[in-house]
């Protein structure tokens, strides 16, 4: 018999470790290809840019791809991957090339085949080509819309079609292997496997070996769609891959534990091709070839791998060293079997059912035929509340969820799809496998197409004959599901023991012998039928099931037995206590005889021994048919003892606790409802709490200590802490009048009264002079107050003398300074100097978005001899303050900080010596150059001058809100892959709290908009503009720029940090994107300023009411609305007001990804770090007079919820960071701006590449 490719490759894998190639994209980047290279001759007139579409290079630059393949092969790669990572019609649609998908794959395979055959001939060592199928840019498991968790922008069938087209091109190009790689969503991979199987069934025999490679996105060990490594393997192993493993996302060192997991749960060979380490701050990969090779050699020595290679950042040099490192290592020996005798299922997590697994509860309540509540919710389209039923089933112990949508009034496939998709958005539910239950096979298929895990299908039978049975079974196997087979054949439902056994035996052999089903994936349901009906022929139904179960388990190895338990007691509808007892007794016996699982109401099964003895005996008699009057006796029992109903859960049970327990519970849970009456109850207990202060120092502070401990341990999140603080304030607010009365009485008696301080310490907080941003500071204040610190919050724009005087007046233990804009850094230095001069030797904390440990260590700490500490966020503030005020820890902590900051300073000054800068003249010479005469002429705006927008419609802005920064305010940060919005809702740690805060935000937004609490105002302006070197001159309308004086000038800063010797990247300046004065091309520049008014006032109202949560919420939403205003207005500028991109049709996600033409950089940000450029904007457009947005002395905008910037329309304009500059540019810039060099250095401090001290 002729050897297949699989035989050939497997023979090599048994002998040695094979080597895969490295990063294709990494190598392509080295060629620094232009748009013209990507287009080639064929696509030079293509309507969309193609740069970045690496896969098209197999058509337009095949010689480059061929050369890269050769480099990897000569470096020692046994297997090269085709350049087809994004060669599906789905991914290519972004470039308008979806019609080329087949050709792209065929060409890529041809190029790789040519290289492999040439090197095989040259070296005498057989080389192989793996056809790469990437994950596409869409996902079946995650909704792109937070408002619609059930929505998907791609279907399983569409993915199958796309993958089938791709695989066909690869197979026609003669690839040896099909490699489904970088799998972040297992559902997508299952669609690829389905497509490949379609081709193998049609006309591509013999099948090619399949390699499968997933992607674990971080140290949590899960894919982007949430699956663990073992669950992923379980979900795709039905395809019988030759190799399975991991690639991308992680470096080798980080990937090791997950490769070990993969190896323990598969009989396939294991492949591993990690990135060259983790990306650095610039997104590049730094791990050297020798380091990467050392890590992978360790894998090999420990017997973990069969194939190794590289992904992102890896090069032929990496592959050469890896090949050499593993050359003499023995390959991993795959185990003959894993989890022998187990049924393997998966949701987001694996679920193994083995010989010693306890009875498996399949939750029954998500069934429109079995739960009236569930049916009502589904009929009403209330899928969100229907999910709560599923979640409750899991919480009550369901290990699998049965989903059934069989109702004549429902569109079954649609309802099943919608509900399964909704489940995928809830990790607490999606962690368990699903049992897709329907009598309509189209509904079953709809459910299977939504599930990334390995499901159970419930059910198929021989009712329609063998042909129908085999067809459905083959399709189920192709989906990778386990199957429930009913004891039902062409003659009807089996009721007798021998008939049940015969039907199941026949089905077993058809499944195992003809379809190739793993016996461990077969579940038989021998029919639990209703007893106690009064019909004699039904009396043996329970006994027949139990006896059939025993025989089936003894004669059909590997199978499991299940059944629908509620059928048993259907005669006793409405008598819940009777039904539950019957179920408990039946299961007690059926499990002993071999029943493995059942569809039950999880959590409602009584323990056999806990059933009342009289009821127990009656159930025993009925089930075992011991008493012909058992049914009547049970009915009489029900009449005597009551039918039994659902238990009522006491939701306010905590109200029965002691007053101390109630106060603590209210604080921890943030419940305001009873806090005043409970506080008053404590106050009236004069024996226990003789003074109101005793209540604050006692139960209230104890409760807040619990809150602080939970927050510090990561078990409470910031929004919850702030709600706790609101409750605390309300309690203290109730006690204050009584405390004041007590003090007044003491003063009358004693003439004076000594003030008592119950706090851990006093801290003065302030946003420094010239800065109006205070959300972060307010949050720190709330968190510190929750941890028994007395917080003196001085607000925003606080002068140094006021800060220091407050510290003296309140006998502060610590001062905390906050700031958002770069000029605030200088004010912080000034405060530190003044503290040193006035000998106020208390710790100084530094925080805020613009601050850093480096700036604190280098610029602030040397000015002050007491502790100066940079605090990252609110969660760190408590620890820092506690250590600074603890006499036992303070000195050691300060010493540690001193040493750490000294190291930072040394590193900083060493880095200044190492940094190299090109002279300004050279940077200008190598700036970004545009051929203005060959480019389309700039579009003239629809008006010159300004247009003011009064009372802008806030409702229009809501869809443009970017929610990620909103969650950052609340310090709710999901772990990868759940960092962004709406993925954060899927995060196991913060997802639930994030959703609560988001819902609160939605409610607040409705109030703000409907009640007109806030007002949005803005201004836009356009002027003729020309560049002169690094500056942009603006002119009045109608003049000839070459013969006129500019009405304003915006000064630019140019990149100077020396670039890599091989780099052709230009040294950017914003002026590069405006036509030069001498070009003869008329160009234009725009500007804008927008703000939300009323935020501070409304926030202050909430704060005065003791509602810190709403106070911070208003500010956070004010900032988001201002940013949304800027986004929405920029869209209008592009399409209407400037109209240089009239046909733009972009969704909000595209706007977020900056897929539009033009940019809107802001002074004070990386592309122009100088805040003083705002002065020109405000003067030119009369911004303060037009809108009310003013500039502070530090050039922060007031109100704080404000955004401003410039508009550039050129299609080649892009955002960049100026980075550090050298002194020659500072001096030149000062000369052009007619400012003293020292003044310019003050404003540009953070970007100076030299020390000014």
Swiss-Prot record:
Q: Which residues form the B12-binding domain?
A: 760-895
The protein's role, per its UniProt record: Catalyzes the transfer of a methyl group from methylcob(III)alamin (MeCbl) to homocysteine, yielding enzyme-bound cob(I)alamin and methionine in the cytosol. MeCbl is an active form of cobalamin (vitamin B12) used as a cofactor for methionine biosynthesis. Cob(I)alamin form is regenerated to MeCbl by a transfer of a methyl group from 5-methyltetrahydrofolate.
Q: Does the keyword Phosphoprotein apply?
A: yes
Quote the record's cofactor note: Binds 1 zinc ion per subunit.
Q: Which cofactor does it need?
A: methylcob(III)alamin; Zn(2+)
Task: Mark the residues carrying the PTM Phosphothreonine.
Answer: 1252
Name the protein family. Belongs to the vitamin-B12 dependent methionine synthase family.
> What biological-process terms (Gene Ontology) are attached?
axon regeneration; cellular response to nitric oxide; cobalamin metabolic process; methionine biosynthetic process; methylation; pteridine-containing compound metabolic process
Which positions fall inside the Hcy-binding domain? 6-326
Any idea what this protein is called? Answer: Methionine synthase
Q: Which InterPro entries match?
A: Cbl-bd_cap, Cobalamin-bd, Cobalamin-bd_sf, Dihydropteroate_synth-like_sf, HCY_dom, HCY_dom_sf, Met_Synthase/Corrinoid, Met_synthase_B12-bd
Can you tell me which residues bind methylcob(III)alamin?
A: 697, 770-774, 818, 822, 874
Q: Name one Pfam family in it.
A: B12-binding
Q: Pterin-binding domain location, by residue?
A: 359-620
Under which pathway is this protein filed?
Amino-acid biosynthesis; L-methionine biosynthesis via de novo pathway; L-methionine from L-homocysteine (MetH route): step 1/1
- Tell me yes or no: is S-adenosyl-L-methionine among this UniProt entry's keywords: yes
Which residues does S-adenosyl-L-methionine bind?
962, 1160, 1215-1216
Q: Which reaction does it catalyse?
A: (6S)-5-methyl-5,6,7,8-tetrahydrofolate + L-homocysteine = (6S)-5,6,7,8-tetrahydrofolate + L-methionine
Species source reads Mus musculus
Q: How does it assemble?
A: Monomer. Dimer. Forms a multiprotein complex with MMACHC, MMADHC and MTRR.
Look up the EC number in the record and give it: 2.1.1.13
Annotated keywords? Amino-acid biosynthesis, Cobalamin, Cobalt, Cytoplasm, Metal-binding, Methionine biosynthesis, Methyltransferase, Phosphoprotein, Repeat, S-adenosyl-L-methionine, Transferase, Zinc
């Amino acid at each position: 018999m002729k050897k297949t490719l699989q035989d050939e490759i497997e023979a090599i894998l048994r002998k040695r470790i094979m080597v895969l190639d490295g990063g294709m994209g990494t190598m392509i980047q080295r060629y620094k290809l232009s748009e013209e290279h990507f287009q080639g001759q064929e696509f030079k007139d293509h309507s969309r840019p193609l740069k970045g579409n690496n896969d098209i290079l197999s058509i337009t630059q095949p010689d480059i791809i061929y050369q890269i393949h050769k480099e990897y092969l000569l470096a020692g790669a046994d297997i090269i991957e085709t350049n087809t990572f994004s060669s599906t019609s789905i991914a290519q649609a972004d470039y308008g090339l979806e019609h080329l998908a087949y050709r792209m794959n065929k060409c890529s395979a041809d190029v790789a085949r040519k290289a492999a055959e040439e090197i095989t001939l040259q070296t005498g060592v057989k080389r192989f080509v793996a056809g790469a199928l990437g994950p596409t840019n869409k996902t079946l498991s995650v909704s792109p819309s937070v408002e619609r968790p059930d929505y998907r922008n791609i279907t399983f069938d569409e993915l199958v079609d796309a993958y089938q087209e791709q695989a066909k091109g690869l197979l026609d190009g003669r690839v040896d292997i099909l490699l489904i790689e970088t799998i972040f969503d297992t559902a997508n991979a299952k669609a690829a496997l389905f497509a490949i199987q379609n081709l193998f069934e049609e006309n591509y025999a013999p099948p090619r070996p399949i390699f499968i490679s997933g992607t674990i996105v971080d140290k949590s060990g899960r894919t982007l769609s949430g699956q663990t490594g073992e669950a992923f393997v379980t979900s795709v192993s039905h395809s019988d891959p030759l190799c399975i493993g991991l690639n991308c996302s992680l470096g080798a060192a980080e990937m090791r534990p997950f490769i070990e997991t993969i190896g323990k749960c598969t009989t396939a060979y294991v492949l591993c091709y990690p990135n060259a380490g983790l990306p650095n701050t610039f997104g590049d990969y730094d791990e050297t070839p020798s380091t990467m090779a050392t890590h992978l050699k360790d894998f090999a020595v420990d017997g973990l791998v069969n194939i190794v290679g590289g992904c992102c950042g890896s090069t032929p040099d990496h592959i050469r060293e890896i090949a050499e490192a593993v050359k003499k290592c023995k390959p991993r020996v795959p185990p003959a079997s894993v989890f022998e005798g187990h049924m393997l299922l998966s949701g987001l997590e694996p679920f193994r059912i083995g010989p010693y697994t306890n009875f498996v509860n399949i939750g029954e309540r998500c069934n429109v035929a079995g739960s009236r509540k569930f049916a009502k919710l589904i009929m009403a389209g209330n899928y969100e509340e229907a999910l709560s039923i599923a979640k409750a089933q899991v919480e009550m112990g369901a290990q699998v969820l049965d989903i059934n949508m069989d109702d004549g009034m429902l569109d079954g496939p649609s309802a099943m799809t919608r509900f399964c998709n909704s489940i995928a958005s809830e990790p607490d539910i999606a962690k368990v496998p699903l049992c897709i239950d329907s009598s309509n096979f189209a509904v079953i298929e709809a459910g299977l197409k939504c599930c990334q895990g390995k499901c159970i299908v419930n059910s198929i039978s021989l009712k329609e004959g063998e042909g129908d049975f085999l067809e459905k079974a083959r399709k189920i196997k192709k989906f990778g599901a386990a199957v429930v087979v009913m004891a039902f054949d062409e003659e009807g439902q089996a009721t007798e023991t021998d008939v049940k056994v015969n039907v199941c035996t026949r089905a077993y052999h058809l499944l195992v012998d003809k379809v190739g089903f793993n016996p461990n994936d077969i579940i038989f349901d021998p029919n639990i039928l209703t007893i106690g009906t009064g019909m004699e022929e039904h009396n043996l139904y329970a006994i027949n099931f139990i006896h059939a179960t025993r025989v089936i388990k003894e004669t059909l190895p590997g199978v499991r037995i299940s059944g629908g338990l509620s059928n048993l007691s259907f005669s006793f509808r409405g008598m819940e206590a009777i039904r539950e007892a019957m179920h408990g007794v039946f299961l007690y016996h059926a499990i002993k005889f071999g029943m493995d699982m059942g569809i039950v109401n999880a959590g409602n099964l009584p323990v056999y021994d806990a059933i009342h003895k009289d009821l127990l005996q009656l159930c025993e008699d009925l089930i075992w048919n011991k008493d012909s009057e058992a049914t009547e006796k049970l009915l009489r029992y029900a009449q005597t003892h009551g039918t039994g109903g659902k238990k009522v859960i006491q939701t306010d049970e905590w109200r029965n606790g002691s007053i101390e327990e109630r106060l603590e519970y209210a604080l921890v849970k943030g419940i305001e409802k009873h806090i005043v009456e409970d506080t008053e109850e404590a106050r009236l207990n004069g024996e226990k709490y003789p003074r109101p202060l005793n209540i604050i120092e006692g139960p209230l502070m104890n409760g807040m200590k619990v809150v602080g401990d939970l927050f510090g341990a990561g078990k409470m999140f910031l929004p919850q802490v702030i709600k706790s603080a609101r409750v605390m304030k309300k309690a203290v607010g109730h006690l204050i009048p009584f405390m004041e009365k007590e003090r007044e009485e003491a003063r009358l008696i004693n003439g004076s009264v000594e003030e008592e301080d119950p706090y851990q310490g006093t801290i003065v907080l302030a946003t420094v002079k010239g800065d109006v941003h205070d959300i972060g500071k307010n949050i720190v204040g709330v968190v510190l107050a929750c941890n028994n610190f007395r917080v003196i919050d001085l607000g925003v724009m606080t002068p140094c003398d006021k800060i220091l005087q407050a510290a003296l007046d309140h006998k502060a233990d610590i001062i905390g300074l906050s700031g958002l804009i770069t000029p605030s850094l200088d004010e912080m230095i000034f405060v530190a100097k003044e503290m040193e001069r006035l000998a106020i030797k208390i710790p100084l904390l530094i925080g805020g978005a613009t601050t850093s440990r480096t700036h604190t260590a280098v610029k602030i700490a040397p000015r002050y001899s007491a502790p100066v500490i940079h605090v990252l966020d609110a969660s760190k503030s408590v620890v820092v303050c506690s250590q600074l005020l603890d006499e036992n820890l303070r000195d050691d902590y300060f010493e540690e900080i001193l040493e750490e900051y000294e190291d930072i300073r040394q590193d900083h000054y060493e880095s200044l010596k190492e940094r190299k800068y090109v002279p300004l003249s050279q940077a200008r010479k190598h700036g970004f150059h545009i051929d203005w005469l060959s480019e389309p002429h700039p579009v003239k705006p629809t008006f010159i001058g300004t247009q003011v927008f009064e009372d802008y419609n806030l409702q229009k802005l809501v869809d443009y809100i970017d929610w990620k920064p909103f969650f950052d305010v609340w310090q709710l940060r999901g772990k990868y892959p759940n960092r962004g919005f709406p993925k954060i809702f899927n995060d196991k740690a913060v997802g639930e709290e994030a959703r609560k805060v988001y819902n609160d935000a939605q409610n607040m937004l409705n109030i703000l908009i409907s009640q007109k609490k806030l007002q949005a105002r803005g201004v836009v302006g356009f002027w003729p503009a020309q560049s002169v070197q690094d500056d942009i001159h603006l002119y009045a309308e109608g003049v000839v720029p070459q013969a006129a004086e500019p009405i304003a000038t915006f000064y630019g800063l140019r990149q100077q940090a020396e670039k890599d010797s091989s780099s052709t990247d230009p040294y950017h300046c914003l002026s590069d994107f405006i036509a030069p004065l001498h070009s003869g091309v008329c160009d234009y520049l725009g500007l804008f300023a927008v703000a939300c008014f009323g935020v501070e006032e409304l926030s202050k109202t909430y704060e005065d009411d003791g509602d810190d949560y709403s106070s911070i919420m208003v500010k956070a939403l004010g900032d988001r609305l201002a940013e949304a205003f800027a986004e929405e207005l920029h869209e209008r500028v592009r399409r209407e007001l400037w109209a240089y991109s009239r046909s733009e049709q972009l969704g909000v996600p595209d706007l977020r990804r900056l897929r539009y033409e033009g940019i809107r950089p802001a002074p004070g940000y990386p592309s122009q770090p100088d805040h003083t450029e705002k002065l020109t904007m405000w003067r030119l457009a009369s911004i303060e007079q037009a809108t009310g947005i003013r500039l502070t002395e530090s050039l922060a905008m007031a109100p704080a919820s404000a955004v401003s910037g410039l508009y550039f329309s050129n299609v080649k304009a892009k955002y960049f960071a100026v980075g550090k500059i050298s002194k020659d540019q500072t001096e030149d810039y000062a000369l052009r701006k007619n400012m003293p060099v020292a003044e310019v250095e003050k404003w540009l401090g953070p970007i100076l590449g030299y020390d000014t001290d």
